[in-house]
Amino acid sequence: MTNSTSDFDGTGKVSGASSEQGLNGYARTPLYDMHLQLGAKMVPFAGYEMPVQYGLGVMGEHLHTREKAGLFDVSHMGQAQLFPEDPDSDVAPVFEALVPGGIISLKERGIRYTQLTNQDGGILDDLMVTRFGNTLWLVVNAACKNDDFAHIAQSLVGKARLSVENRALLSLQGPLAEAVLKEHLPAAAD
């Protein structure tokens, strides 16, 4: 399992962070080997080899998630931390200039779904933002991640530093997701 971090240079390229590459040229998430061991059918998606289904099949898994809960590997999505250039300041006011969602008011470990905007206020992409102290954790869509990170880095030069993460990311979805989380990770369910 890989877990790496790198600074984004603002040119549209990430230096230092990488995903394992398969023989077919598609990237692999840190959970790739586990998916194979569990019998997943892998398909190309957003430049990655991703699991499309397991034994229940697409419809069975869909219904199970809608009725109960399903766990998804979303490690292909763009993940980054945003740090203030001045470690004694808060990065939220700087980042809030790029999104319509209230980031300054975000509570510790609070999450906000919002949109990344261009200089004219047009929407470039949607993203999730989580506050950790004076830093922010960002999750953006896989297909747009390099463009999103370039826009953020270029817009915040001298104000913030973007550090791209390459690690596993899971999404637990469905009406029983909270109960499943409480059963297996009680502290995380709060």
Residue ranges and their predicted role:
Residues 2-190:
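Basic, glycine/lysine-rich polyanion-binding surfaces/domains
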